């Protein structure tokens, strides 16, 4: 980054008094520099963060990016396996999404990393080799499952509900067995992704709960030590999480972790996030966590495909800068830690989904996105998701929210995972 960045130098005497979002109040002096360094970050210590607190990253797109020619570096500017770089920065858990069959009838990938079980194994083995546990995130769809769509896998489309239950159980168990056989250290399994209003093509909560239990049963039978997580979103909507948690309880759904997405520009205040997660934990005895979060460090687009943030109408509670990004991540960690012992941790979503090439070479980028699935969706996804991917396919929509710059070098904000444990005051230079 060549633009000038403000650096804040906080005196130790005011360390305990300043809030993370109010770090400007602790300024001793201000200095303009050409580039922010990791040692220049101000990160207030997160109180209540135990040694097992999850500091996770979802890097599901990484294989497709590397196949597209993307190279990642360490903090010294040397080429290095990104999983080693993440580990050195304090990341201790890797999340990977799994789609049933993200390919068309000719074998062309839908994009978004083309994340099938085999990709999950590749990613999982590299994470395990670097001493990180793995969260297997089953979407139970052939492409993106989120609040707007929970499309049933093509192969399950004509099944009866009872047959679908059997297939979900079988698919989950067989996939986990494959991953474990390959040496992947799975610590947690997500049965569904952002299943706020649907799951595997079902929208009736009674049926959804039965499907949740089939996935959970498969996990329990595979390894009883693996945590079962259910994942929802929109914590800002009044009464949503209390309704979901109560419904799960009434339907006797077997799970360990109530997980939420939390994006600062969409999902309300951190105080509310803590409140709704704490209520679930205290009322139903569940562990809680944030399964997805991220924030912008620049308003610039890197690859010629538009980004999800910033957009008009969004609330951006932190500066759009490397320091603002680090503070945003730190504050989400604090929000989860503030739920008490039930708070497991936080996963950053796609911190490495950077451009496959500069936006000035967008035509070349398009070829790479189509060939390797390194964009959020390829044109081939139109047969499965014609209304969304079929119209808006293209590159990375979050390259300006990555924790690596557009050329694959780690941003100083990547160090927030380790700085949050003890806090960090920048040194003058």
Swiss-Prot record:
One of the Pfam families matching this protein, by short name: Glyco_hydro_53
- Which keywords accompany this UniProt record? Calcium, Glycosidase, Hydrolase, Metal-binding, Secreted, Signal
Residues recorded as binding substrate, renumbered to this chain, are 146-149, 233-234, 267, 296, 311, 388
The note describing how and how many cofactors are bound reads:
Binds 1 Ca(2+) ion per subunit.
Q: What does this protein do?
A: Involved in galactan degradation. Degrades arabinose-free galactan to galactooligosaccharides, producing galactotetraose as the main product along with galactotriose, galactobiose, and galactose. Is also able to degrade galactotetraose, galactotriose and galactobiose, suggesting an additional exo-mode of activity. May hydrolyze the beta-1,4-galactan linkages of the galactan portion of arabinogalactan type I, a pectic plant polysaccharide from which most of the arabinose has been removed.
What does UniProt give as the signal peptide span? 1-21
Q: Which organism is this protein's natural source?
A: Bacillus subtilis (strain 168)
The record's GO CC annotations read:
extracellular region
- Summarize induction of expression: Repressed by the transcriptional regulator GanR and induced by galactobiose. Also repressed by glucose.
The residues the record assigns to binding Ca(2+) are 301, 303, 305, 307, 396, 399
| Protein's name in the database | Endo-beta-1,4-galactanase
Q: Which cysteines are joined by disulfide bonds?
A: none
Name the reaction it catalyses.
The enzyme specifically hydrolyzes (1->4)-beta-D-galactosidic linkages in type I arabinogalactans
Q: Which residues form the active site?
A: 194, 292
Task: List the EC numbers from the record.
Answer: 3.2.1.-, 3.2.1.89
Biological process, per Gene Ontology: pectin catabolic process
Q: Does the keyword Chaperone apply?
A: no
Q: How does activity depend on temperature?
A: Optimum temperature is 50 degrees Celsius with AZCL galactan as substrate.
- PANTHER family documented for this protein: ARABINOGALACTAN ENDO-BETA-1,4-GALACTANASE A, ENDO-BETA-1,4-GALACTANASE
> Molecular function terms in GO for this entry?
arabinogalactan endo-1,4-beta-galactosidase activity; glucosidase activity; metal ion binding
Q: Which SUPFAM superfamilies match?
A: (Trans)glycosidases
Name its cellular compartments.
Secreted
Q: Which cofactor does it need?
A: Ca(2+)
Q: Which gene encodes it?
A: ganB
Q: Which PROSITE patterns match?
A: PROKAR_LIPOPROTEIN
Q: Which family does it belong to?
A: Belongs to the glycosyl hydrolase 53 family.
- Record field: pH dependence: Optimum pH is 6.5 with AZCL galactan as substrate.
């Amino acid at each position: 980054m060549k633009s000038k960045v403000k650096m804040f130098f906080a005196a130790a005497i005011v360390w305990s008094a300043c809030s993370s979002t109010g770090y400007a109040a602790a300024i001793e002096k201000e200095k303009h520099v050409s580039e922010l360094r990791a040692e220049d970050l101000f990160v207030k210590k997160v109180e209540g963060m135990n040694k097992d607190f999850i500091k996770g990253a979802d890097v599901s797109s990484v294989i497709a990016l590397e196949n597209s020619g993307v190279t990642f570096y360490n903090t010294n500017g040397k080429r290095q396996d990104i999983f080693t770089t993440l580990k050195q920065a304090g990341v201790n858990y890797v999340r990977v999404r799994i789609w049933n069959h993200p390919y068309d009838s000719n074998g062309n990938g839908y994009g978004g990393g083309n994340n099938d079980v085999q990709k999950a194994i590749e990613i999982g083995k590299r994470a395990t080799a670097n001493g990180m546990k793995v969260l297997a995130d089953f979407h139970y769809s052939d492409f993106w499952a989120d609040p707007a769509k929970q499309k049933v896998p093509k192969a399950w489309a004509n099944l009866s509900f009872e047959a679908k239950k059997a297939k979900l159980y079988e698919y989950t168990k067989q996939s986990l067995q494959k991953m474990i056989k390959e040496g992947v250290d799975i610590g947690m399994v997500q049965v569904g992704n952002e299943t706020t209003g649907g799951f595997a093509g079902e929208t009736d909560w009674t049926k959804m709960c039965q499907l949740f239990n089939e996935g959970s049963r498969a996990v329990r039978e595979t390894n009883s030590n693996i945590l079962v997580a259910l994942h929802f979103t929109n914590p800002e909507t009044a009464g949503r999480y209390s309704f979901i948690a109560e419904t799960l309880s009434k339907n006797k759904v077997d799970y360990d972790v109530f997980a939420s997405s939390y994006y600062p520009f969409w999902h309300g205040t951190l105080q509310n996030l803590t409140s709704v997660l704490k209520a679930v934990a205290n009322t139903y005895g569940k562990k809680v966590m944030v399964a997805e979060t991220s924030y912008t460090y620049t308003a610039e687009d890197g690859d010629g495909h538009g980004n999800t943030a910033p957009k008009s109408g969004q609330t951006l509670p932190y500066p759009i800068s490397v320091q603002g990004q680090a503070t945003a991540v730190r504050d989400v960690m604090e929000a989860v830690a503030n739920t008490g012992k039930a708070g497991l941790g936080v996963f950053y979503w796609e911190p490495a989904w950077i451009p496959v090439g500069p936006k000035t070479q967008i035509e070349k980028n398009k070829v790479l996105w189509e060939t390797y699935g390194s964009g959020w969706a390829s044109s081939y996804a139109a047969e499965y998701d014609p209304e969304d991917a079929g119209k808006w396919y293209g590159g990375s929509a979050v390259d300006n929210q990555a924790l690596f710059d557009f050329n694959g070098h780690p941003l100083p904000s990547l160090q927030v995972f380790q700085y949050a444990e003890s806090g960090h005051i920048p040194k003058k230079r």
